[in-house]
Amino acid sequence: MKFTVLTLFPEMFAPVHESILKRAQAAQLIEVSLINFRDYAASKHKNVDDVPYGGGAGMVLKPEPLFAALRDLPPSPGRRRIVLLSPQGEVFQQRKAEEWSRWDELVFICGHYEGFDERIRSLADEEVSLGDFVLTGGELAAMVMMDAVARLLPGVLGEKASAEEDSHSGGLLEYPHYTRPPVFEGMEVPDVLLSGHHRRIEEWRRKESLRRTFLKRPDLFAKVEFRAGDFNLLEELIREHPELAQERSRWEHLRPKPKKRR
């Protein structure tokens, strides 16, 4: 996959040349192209912004440099998606990262200053926001989104399961992790993780994911589609967290049918 970023500050993207993204580029699993759209400004002083019509605070990005920069992109050999990073856009979530991971090229337009000339919006296929807060520019948001998408690509993490088990990948928060030593300052690793019993370990992890999501992110828990095997785990959680009982109707249909007597 190719990530193309239109930005006024390409030097801010040093982190994409470290860690997992660095290895992914070395293995030619991803490509990162940084384009300073100031280079496409036609004025003598390379101005990319101007005062807003009608007055007001701040400066507004001019349309000409970004239109020129996008038109100068080489043809994409596959499917290209152009994303305008904007606080007015759809809030970025894991499902969006999964959707984007199926494209061949993502082009991020990073804003700065007070905002964009409205005509710039016509360049994008979609507008996306990192969250309901305001950043100085789109660069940090672009890096976060690139990381979230890249780790879903085959071979980037090394193990497909690593991405599949991450928080939010299945609508649930991730289960707790432990490593050596088995006891640290009186805090012990759960016995089940030391048992070597793979089915019990998987059940424990699923139960803890359900627990964490219910306690920490009830908004996510309200959207979870439960599996057939979740019924007993959820009933156990009700005994530990009685307030969960009010949700029981959501998984009652998963109750195992009583075995017929012969």
Curated annotation (Swiss-Prot):
Record: residues binding S-adenosyl-L-methionine: 111, 130-135
Alphabetized PANTHER family for the sequence: TRNA (GUANINE-N(1)-)-METHYLTRANSFERASE (PTHR46417:SF1)
Principal cellular location given in the protein's record: cytoplasm
InterPro entries documented for this protein: Alpha/beta_knot_MTases, tRNA_m1G_MeTrfase_C_sf, tRNA_m1G_MeTrfase_TrmD, tRNA_m1G_MTases_N, tRNA_MeTrfase_TRMD/TRM10
Organism: Desulfitobacterium hafniense (strain Y51)
E.C. number: 2.1.1.228
Catalytic activity: guanosine(37) in tRNA + S-adenosyl-L-methionine = N(1)-methylguanosine(37) in tRNA + S-adenosyl-L-homocysteine + H(+)
Class of the enzyme per the UniProt entry, highest EC level: transferase
Gene designation per UniProt: trmD
Protein name, per record: tRNA (guanine-N(1)-)-methyltransferase
GO CC aspect terms: cytosol
Biological process (GO), any one: tRNA N1-guanine methylation
Matching Pfam families: tRNA_m1G_MT
Family label: Belongs to the RNA methyltransferase TrmD family.
Domain of life: Bacteria
Subunit structure, as described in the record: Homodimer.
Subcellular location: Cytoplasm
Function: Specifically methylates guanosine-37 in various tRNAs.
